[in-house]
Each structure stands twice: as structure tokens, then as C-alpha cells.
Amino acid sequence: MMSRKKRRLWIVIACGIGLSTAVALMLFAFRSSLSFFMSPEQVAARHPPPGRVFRLGGIVQANTVVMGTRNGAPYTTFRITDGRASIPVVYTGVLPGLFRQGQGVVTIGAMAKGDSEFMASTVLAKHGADYMPRDVEMALRKAGKWNPKFGPPPNAGAWDDKSPAQIEASNNG
Amino acid sequence: MSVSRRMLFGLPLLVVGAGGVGFYELLRRMRTGSYNPQAFDNPLVGHDVPDFTLPGVNGRKGFDKPVLAAQKRPVLVNFFASWCVPCAGEAPYLDRLAKAGVDIWGIAYQDKPEAIALYLAKYGNPYARLATDPSGRTAINWGVYGVPESFLIAPGGKVVWHIAAPLVPEIIDDQLRPAMQRLT
Amino acid sequence: MIPTLGNFALALALAIAVAQSVIGIAGPMLRDRLILRTAPALAISQFVMLGLSFLALVWAGVVSDFTVRNVAEYSSSTTPLLYRITGTWGNHDGSILLWCLILSLCGATVGAFGNSIPTSLRSRVLGVLGLISAGFMAFVIAVSNPFARIWPPPLHGAGVNPILQDPGLAVHPPILYTGYVGFSIAFAFAVAALIEGRVDAAWGRWVRPWALVSWLFLTCGICFGSLWSYYTLGWGGYWFWDPVENVALLPWLTGTALIHSAIVVEKREALKTWSVLLAIATFSLSLCGTFLVRSGLLNSVHAFSASPAQGLFILVLLALTIGGSLLLFAFRAPALAASGVFAPVSREGALILNNIFLCIIAAVVFTGTMYPPFLDLLFNRQISVGAPFYDQTVLPLTAPLILAMAVGPMMSWKRAVLLPALTKLWFGAVVALIVFGAFILRGHFVAALGLAGAVWVMIGALIDLAERVRLFRVPLRQSFARLFTIPRAAIGASLGHLGFGIAVLGIAGMSLQVHTIRVLNPGQSIDLGGYNWKLISIAPAKGANYAAREATIEVTRNGHFVEMMHPETRFFTNQKVKTVAAAISTNGVRNLFATFAGDNDSGGGEFRFNIHPLAPEIWLGGLIMALGGAISLTDRRFRVGAPVRNRLRRPSGSATV
């Protein structure tokens, strides 16, 4: 049986080997799989190479969403904008329920060959624990976010007379 | 008991302490707005305002980018609308800011002249200058996706701060004031 | 009225907790027997008060008392009764109150059932628990009080988040929190031992059942959380390496290391420093997790409504708890008696290796989770770390663990020879190699490795059990009888390892999944994975507070009927939110998974179909692990004062426990 000191040395060596393996794996993983986030303006400026996976986030530009089917599978094209540039995105699959025009999304994917479109493999729309969907009623109660999809804003002149129920009725009608 | 062995026992405490300092700093930055993991960063922050020209409303003159960039003092650009209830909520605080000497320029988003006039008559007019963006296209160029939103523009036209929420006192004290102080 | 009483009960509980902490920690120094007996009574009354407070909040939810702001914001009169009750903990303030309740339950349990622990140690343990309780209750009352009132009350509440309106909400948070918070007991034992300046074999024996209970609940909690996201989120994913999931995994990893090293403390009086540090670390990670999730520091799809002010309070609590305990550790731990002697190749050595690897994996997960905010802090760069990072780091690091898991139980204490231990496992090695070869030939490299590893662990666990009952070496009837006389902890350990192997089997199987997305009209069908999926109809349906569109899918295989599946999309009228309810069909070894995304214009709809091989095994494995832990707890050594009957004749030279 070896002395305590020698055994301690073995333990330290084992820890060292384990740690260096872990660090090496991490460095390798960081280099190859960190998905960097780019906005449309950065994409337009930097032209990431086709096939390189990254996250593209921005606002879904209103009136650019086109849905169709390709080989029986549903696909959607739309443009993501950050106000300075807009990138066309193609997504094959089922869009999340929170996806709406004029709202923020994050997509993961890569540029197609020819640098023309962003082929998205995932589309994410976020939500928080207190569900605050961006529709007119909640917008008027909380933070004033208005979704263009729900039609033109109500006339402010008649505003103060309406009760919450009347506002809701006029928005749904 | 060797010194190095004693130090080894203190190592966890040191690591945790460093982490704690880091967390505290992150929290502090969240309060001032310079770190926001949930946000959709407005891409304009740190850049110049985009080119734009907006007409005035109800007899007033609008403004455009050159005029804004030529200002010698910081300008708070506030996107609002008459049909937006929280805008009415932040109106008294904007009034207070204007009276304290802050230059506030307003942009009415997707609104009608009569409605704007009614709104300003009712809630007060804190705006040194007022323009209107009926189509909302300029707002898109600014990265606005709802109202109210406010931007702090430094002299020369660079956007240094942005908030996508009503300017309530906590935000004014925690974020806007430090941002303005950084400019002076 | 009742919410006010609830608030009062909460304040009273805080006062009791403060008293408990003072009396608990200072008591042993005064050597007054009466004072020493007060701490358990205080712990139990603290729990009673918190129980009443919690019940008051639940009552407010049940009767839809909208003067309580928490109820107005997170419940409504149209919410079904089950979710009016369980929605109490479906939001930040209510869930922190649940946290406090469970913390006080831990103290009450130690007070009521810890009679075999020496009085002074128990008193200190209760004192530490009281201190932590007091901190959290102060947080609730000061910054996050669920009993805050609003006037006038709104007519309707905002309603429970639709995604949370699921029986899972009733089950997942309480179980998970019991796991998280339960490790406070092991933590308190560690701190109390450091205060006393003594860690011995008895300490190991007392800590282990409390750590096992917490570990068991945490395993179930994580398992159930994964199952819940699997059937709720509609993508068929079960683990996303989301920061909130990672912060639940971290204490599980160190907790597993703790229950293993507590064994060594108990049997060999070794690894004391390590065990104390692990006990502190596990609860510290639980606390860190609470902090990270509720402060809003981490960007996650599970985001709790957060505020930096609350985050700051919790950070201070963390600094005091973790900093205080580690300071104590730095000063007192070096004085702990030096460990017993053993060779590197021995069961102790294997357990040390196990600890090292579990802790390294925990460190990697922690780094991945904290990398984005700290990179932003130090270098002002925004990045995000996702599943690919963890797949490339954690999965390779589990390989040595899997290999060692089968070998460790074969080794004897103090000094073992490796070759005989490995030879006993020949059967497992052979089957694993066959499985590996079979899947490599089909081109599935990752699945081959995973399945082979899983089989190795599963057979190793069974061989361990077989060795103990001397299967094939004594008459079968005697082996069977031995099953009831060997220590239950041994059965528990085998089951635990078996469960882990089964879970790995499921995870590896999921890597072989197939899926497709299609637009189908009624009458159309597609083929996937040997099954034929046919859309029969789409019709409206209705739930308690939602309207739905329900699709009917007929699944057949080779012409034989398999299942009718009914995926739905649901529209919740109160929040105007649309969710997807997946249809899952299981036969124990594979899952069929169908989601319906919405109608198209021609009477049909968009569908996503998946086949998940071996998916049920993921959660079955987790449950079996927890079952192993539960069986270990029934070991007679953990029961109060039961004499150990020496029924077995001791054979020599073999691995005994």
C-alpha cells in the first residue's frame, strides 16, 4: 500500500488529467459550435459564408410573410428586419404559435449558397412567465405595444369614454 | 500543516467570492440597462440615427436628421401616439423632464393630426419639437416596434441609450439620468 | 381576512425561525438541556405557521379573491379548480413561498425524526436551517410578498399561463423543490460538523439518508420536468440545456457525488473533507440556481418574471450562506482528522474517480451556463451557448463514468485487484460489443456508443446483484432467500445503476428518431418509419377555458390498426394565446408523436410526425433510479435503534458491504 503522500499525488494527477480533458473539449466545442448572434445589418455587412450556422434575430417585417407548400411540406418565406437592413428567410416547417408580423423572432440557420437567402432550421418566438401577448387589449393595459396585424389604432378622441369591455369589443369587431 | 495545504482549503471561498462580485456587477448593469439578457437590443444604440425627414403637424415644423445631429445638447426623442394609453401614463413624467430642462422631441407614430392635437391639449405638450410619422416607416428604420419608446441622442447624432417602455420615475432615475450624466 | 391571516402567519414563522437559529446554534454552548430540546419544537411550529400561510394563499386562489394581487395577476375565475390550486406556485412569489414551506418542512422533519442524532449536533443543524429559513422569509416579506393586496380588485384575473395549465404543474414544482431544498439538510449537517470540528463515521451514517431523500426527489423532479416539456412543447424534445434546466442538473450531479462519498465516510472514515465540501456545494448550487433564474440574469425560455432588486436581495442571501459556510470550511476543515488508508485500486479509489468525474461534468455545465453573461461582463461580447456545446463536452465526459460504474461495485474495500473484478463482467462486455457492432454496421456511430454503454451499465448492475445473491453458485432457492437478507442499500445501489443504464438507453435510442412535416388533407396519408399516418378529419373541440381544433389521425402498420391519435391546437380565450397539444402513443419501447399546427385553406392542415425509439426508457430509467434510492432508505441501518442481526455466515475474501 502506498503512502498517503503518494496517493494524494495520484489523486492530483487524476484530477489534472480529467480537468485538462474537460478544458480541451470545451475549447474545441466553443470554437465550433458557439452560435453567434447577428442582426440583419451585420449579415448584410459581413456576408457570413454559406453553411455557417448562426442566429439571426430581428422583427418580422410586416406584409412580407408568404406561406406555401413545397413537396407537400409547408414552407414560409418572410423578411427579418432591424430597421437598417432586411434579410429574406426561408423556413420549412411549422411556425411557433407566437410568430406574428411586426414582432420579434430569433431564427437559427445558415445562409444559402449564393448568399441570397437565410435557410432557417429553427424559428423561436419568446415568451415570459407572465404571458403578455401583443394584442391590442393587453397592449393598452400594460406597455403600449401595438401589433399592426390587429388593424388600425382606435380613434383617440373616443378613447376616454370607453370601458375595458368596450375597447375589447371594438378591437374584436 | 503546510501553508499551501491551508491555502487550498481557502480556494473555494476565493472562487465563489470572485463569482459573487461578477454577479453583483451583472445585476448592477441590469439596473442601468447596459446588460439586458432578455432584450432585443436595439441595433441603433452606439450608432448614428438613420437618415430621415419627417413633416410637422398642426402648423408646426417637423425635423430631420441633420437638424437633430446639429444640436449642441442631448435630445430625448420620444415615439408616442394619441391612442396609446401608457403614453398618457408617461406624459406627466415627460412634462417634469421638460421643465427640468431636458430637450424632448416627439414623433407621433401612425396617428392623425386632430387626435394628436386633442392628446397634447389633454396631457400637456413637453415637446420642444414635434414631427409625425403616419406610415410608421421611419419608426421601423429606428427599430421601434411599439409605443412608447424613447432614444437619447448625443450631440452629433449618435444614439447612446434606448428604452422600449414608458419613462416612469424608476427608469428615469436608474437609466436615463446616468446615461445623460455620461454625456456631460 | 384570510390572506391577512396568512401574511401574519408568515411573519410569525419568520420570528420563530430567528429564535430557532439563535437557540439552535448557541444552545449547545450553554449546555442547558431544556434549551437544547427547544430547537426541534421551534422547527415544528415554524413549519405549522408556514403551512397555514401557504394554505391561506391557496384558499385565496380557490375562491378567486382578486384583492390579493398574486391571484389577480396569475389566476382567474374561469380557471379550472386544479389550476386555481396549483397555480399558486406557477409564478414567482407563490413559488418562493413554496420554497420556504419545504425548507421549514426539512427542519420539522429533522426535529421530529432525528432522535438518533446527538442532541448538540441536531440542535446546530436546526439552528443552521433556521438561519436559512429566516433569510428566505425575510426576502419574501420584504420584496416578494404574495399576500400584497390591490384595491379595487379587478373583475377578472389575468389567468394562469396556458402552457402551465397541465397536471404537470401540480406535480413538477413541489417535487423539484423538495429535491433542491432537501439538500439544505445535508448542508446544515456539514456546517454543524464544521462548527463542532468533528466529522466521523457516524456523521456519514446520519447524512446519507437525508441526502438520499433529497437526491431521490431531485431525480424525480428533473425526470418529470423533462417528461413535461416533452409532451407540452410539441417539438418532441426532452432536454434543451436551457439555463433553468442546467441549474437543476448541477445540484443533481454534486448530490450524486455526495451520496457516493458519504458511503466512504461511513465505512472507511475517509473522504471527509470531500464530503463536507460536496454537501456545501450541492445546496449552494441550489441557491445559485434560485438566484440565476429569479434575477433575470440568464436568458431562458422558462423566464420567471424577474427584477434586479429581488436578484440583489437573493445575492446577499447567497453571499451570507455560501460565503459563510466556505469561510468556516477554510478555517475548520484542515483540522478534520486525516483520512483512512487505502490503495488507489480499490472501491474507495473508484468512488474518488466517480466524484472527480461528476464534479468535472458539473463544472463544465456550470461554465457553459455562465459563459454568456460573464463574457458580456468581461469582454462585452454577446454570444449564446446551446445544445451542441454540451453535446460535445458532457457526452464524452460521461464515457469514463459509464465504464467505471459497472466496475466499481465489483471492487473490494481498501485494496482490490482489477482483473478479477473485470472478469466478472465478461457477459456485459460481450453483449455491449455485440450491440456496438450491430449499430455501427448500420452507420449510427453515436447511437452505437450510447447503446453499448447503456447495456454495459445495465448488465453490470444486474451482475452486481447476482454476485451478492450468489446466483448460480448456490441453489436457486437460496439465492432468492438471500435477496431479502442482503442489505437493502445494496439492492438500492444496483437499482440505481440499472436505472441510469436504462435512461442512457433511452437517450441513445432517441438519437435514432425519424420525423417529417407534411400538409395533409382529410383522407391523405404518408408513410414514416414503417407506419402509415392517415388524416381522418379535423373538427372543433372545447375545453374548460379554451376552444380547440382537433385532428384525428389513424396510424396503421402493415395494414394492422395501431392507434387513433388526436393532436389539437388550443386557443385560450382569456389570454388570446394559441398552444399546441401533441398526441403521444406509447407501447413501452417506442413513442409515436404527432402535432397539428393549424388548418390550411383547403380543409386540411399542417402536421408533424415523429417516431421516438426507446423514448419511454428515458423517464422509466429516472424513476427506477429514484426507486433505488427509496429502497436504500428502507435499509435497517437507517432506522432508529434497530439492532443489526447477524444472520449471514461471513465468507472470506469477497467484496462485502
From Swiss-Prot, chain A:
SUPFAM superfamilies, sorted: Heme chaperone CcmE (SSF82093)
Name of protein: Cytochrome c-type biogenesis protein CcmE
Gene (name only): ccmE
Role summary: Heme chaperone required for the biogenesis of c-type cytochromes. Transiently binds heme delivered by CcmC and transfers the heme to apo-cytochromes in a process facilitated by CcmF and CcmH.
Chain positions recorded as heme binding sites: 127, 131
Any Gene Ontology biological process: cytochrome complex assembly
Any matching Pfam family: CcmE
Region annotation Disordered: where it falls in the sequence: 145-173
Gene Ontology MF annotations: heme binding; metal ion binding
Signal peptide region: none
Domain of life of the organism encoding this protein: Bacteria
Gene3D superfamilies: Nucleic acid-binding proteins
Protein keywords: Cell inner membrane, Cell membrane, Cytochrome c-type biogenesis, Heme, Iron, Membrane, Metal-binding, Signal-anchor, Transmembrane, Transmembrane helix
Transmembrane segments: 9-29
Classification via HAMAP family: CcmE (MF_01959)
Residue numbers on the Cytoplasmic membrane side: 1-8
Parts of the chain on the Periplasmic side: 30-173
Family recorded in the similarity comment: Belongs to the CcmE/CycJ family.
Compartment(s) of residence: Cell inner membrane
InterPro entries: CcmE (IPR004329), CcmE-like_sf (IPR036127), NA-bd_OB-fold (IPR012340)
Bilayer disposition of the protein: Single-pass type II membrane protein
Gene Ontology cellular-component annotations: plasma membrane
Record organism: Acidiphilium cryptum (strain JF-5)
Organism phylogeny: Bacteria, Pseudomonadati, Pseudomonadota, Alphaproteobacteria, Acetobacterales
